[in-house]
Regions:
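Short helix-to-coil transition segments within interhelical loops
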Residues: 89-96
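Transmembrane helix-boundary elements of multi-pass transport/secretion proteins
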Residues: 3, 7-84, 98, 104-116, ...
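Residues within well-ordered alpha helices
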Residues: 89, 121-123
Length: 164
């Protein structure tokens, strides 16, 4: 277990070097929120069913973060490891390929959660974001969506021979 956390720490450092993942998981959703929040504000309107524009669009931005990490970052990293034969090199070490996959899974989940925290905190501070649902149901939905998207990403990464 200790080895898994060490691998995860190394993978975390590696994912923070990838500009595309950082941009689309952390910066782009925040820019979208700031852009459309500044244009439309968060006043309740009849068009939005009595909710504010930021209140309605933030769940879409959260799903965008999940999709970027699960369908872009996760499978591309797995394909890159296959292309560069990194997983094959780990076969001669005590590290198991499952530990590499789990560490990638944990790192991408951490990036997703970090992106969501930044997005929701900024939405609350800048636009007074409201949540009109049950927190437990939202967490369960988040986990189900996360597992579904990451399963698709693992499938794509497993089929890909290279990053192209």
């Amino acid at each position: 277990m200790n080895r898994l956390w060490k691998i995860t720490a190394v993978e975390w450092k590696l994912i923070n070097r990838e500009f595309i993942t950082l941009f689309f998981a952390l910066i782009f959703p925040v820019l979208m929120l700031l852009l459309f929040g500044t244009i439309y504000g968060n006043r309740p309107s009849e068009i939005m069913g009595g909710y504010g524009t930021v209140d309605v669009s933030t769940p879409a931005y959260t799903n965008m973060i999940i999709a970027v990490t699960g369908l872009m970052s996760f499978p591309l990293t797995l394909a890159q490891y296959r292309e560069k034969k990194i997983l094959r090199r780990f076969m001669v070490t005590p590290v198991k390929p499952v530990e590499i996959l789990l560490s990638q899974f944990f790192v991408n989940i951490l990036m997703t959660v970090l992106g969501l925290v930044v997005l929701i905190a900024l939405g609350k501070v800048v636009f007074d974001l409201h949540f009109y649902g049950n927190v437990l149901e939202a967490i369960v939905a988040f986990i189900v969506i996360l597992l579904g998207i990451f399963s698709i990403g693992l499938f794509i990464g497993g089929l890909s021979k290279n990053m192209k």
